[in-house]
């Protein structure tokens, strides 16, 4: 994973124009409920996210050019109200060189972020050249056509069965999709070898809406 973080950090560093590589770490995949969260659970999530931000900052320091400073900070977006909070959205502005989305639950994540000012800010940053990366669920949301998981009691060994997958490719005004600015010609899956997901990735291609590449 260190190599992955360094690759992300290198892309963020390449976007930097003032000697300070600004990266925002986003835990909107962490919640169990997209609309409410307890104070203790929020604090525990923030502690974990801060740890991950430290790893990302270290990865950046390893690849930054001489004279560049790396700053990775967590933006506390965990539920939908957070994604609509102007104070949080302001931290996703034009000065950001990279956005990193943490792992968790991609279906919760899209219910938190879809069609919010925060998603619009991420899209604007991406369009301006900022790096956007993620791991686990944070990688899953990076494709517009998203694998949400399995349906019902289906699991990895049902991956080739039609209807076994929870596939998200609703219209832009829904939350049944990956990020609106995500990869349009590919679908991203994760933990493919560790969790036996090759079959479900193949099935996602069979059921795909239009031509897609599996990543």
Please describe what each predicted stretch is.
Residues 100-101, 132-135, 214-215:
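General beta-strand structural signal in soluble alpha/beta enzymes
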Residues 7, 202-207:
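Short, solvent-exposed amphipathic alpha-helical segments in soluble enzyme
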Residues 69-71, 129, 212:
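A generic structural signal for alpha->beta connector loops
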Residues 14-16, 91-95, 124-127, 179-182, ...:
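Extracellular/periplasmic catalytic domains that process cell-envelope and extracellular macromolecules
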Residues 207-215:
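Short, intrinsically disordered, charge-balanced linker/junction segments flanking boundaries
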Residues 110-198:
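Class I SAM-dependent methyltransferase SAM-binding "motif I" and its flanking Rossmann-like core
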Residues 95, 200-201:
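First exposed extracellular module after export/assembly in secreted or surface-exposed proteins
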Residues 1-107:
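Extended, subdomain-level signal for the structured scaffold at the beginning of enzyme domains
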